Each structure stands twice: as C-alpha cells, then as structure tokens.
Amino acid sequence: TAHDPLIRMALVPRMLEARGLDVTPGIMRRFEAIGDHETAAVLQIILREEVGHVQFGSRWFHYLCEQRGLEPEQTYFDLLENFLNGEIRCPLHHEARREAGFSNQELQRLEALCAGG
C-alpha cells in the first residue's frame, strides 16, 4: 500500500487496526476471567487509543476520496474486494467502529462479508 495513501488508509487503519477494535474486548474478558485485572485495564487503554488511530485513518481516507472524486463507502468495499477477496472476520465491535468513523451502513455491509456468513 506504500504507493497510494488512499489504499493505505483503507487497509491499514480501517481494516487491520479496526480488527484490533473487534478482538480486544474478548481478550480483556479472558484476562478478567483469570483474575488479571491489571492487564485487562491496560488493554482498555489500548482499545481507546486504537479507536483514535482508526478514526484518524477514516478521516484521511474520506478526505483522499473527496480529493479524487470517489464515493468513500463504495471505494472502501472495492478495495476490500480487490485486496482481501471481500472476506473479513467477525464479530465486529460496532460501538468502537462507529466511534472510529464507520457508518451503520458500512457495518451492515461488513457483517454481510463475514467469513461463514
């Protein structure tokens, strides 16, 4: 993605880092279950910071789409299809993704692409 910042913003913050938003709550629960509350608290801080990273990428992605006359949502899903064969892993952390700049419609479309259903 180094050759195109639009592609980088779509795939690094809005796909890879956003996946961190999805999986962190489950990891936190596992640490809580074994009594490691300190690690769970650290992961909560990391989750909050990760929302900011994804939000930053979302803003830049939308800005770059606007500069190129591209519709952001369709462009994002076209890139997911081209680079990931349109398949993603779930579950999604809807609240964190919304806070990070994903629309409800994007979340619905992402859910439809989840592996296995």
PLM feature segments, named:
Residues 1-117:
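Non-heme di-metal
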